[in-house]
Amino acid sequence: ARGPQLRLRF
């Protein structure tokens, strides 16, 4: 998903 998790698996 495109949210606060997009930095976890760049």
Curated annotation (Swiss-Prot):
Transmembrane segments: none annotated. It is found in: Secreted. The modification Phenylalanine amide is found at F10. The keyword Secreted applies. Keywords: Amidation, Hormone, Neuropeptide, Secreted. One of its GO terms (molecular function) is hormone activity. It comes from the Eukaryota. GO terms for biological process: neuropeptide signaling pathway. The keyword Phosphoprotein does not apply. Its main location: secreted. GO terms for cellular component: extracellular region. Neuropeptide. Stimulates egg development in L.migratoria, but not in N.bullata. May be involved in the regulation of adult diapause. Belongs to the NPY family. This is Neuropeptide NPF-1.
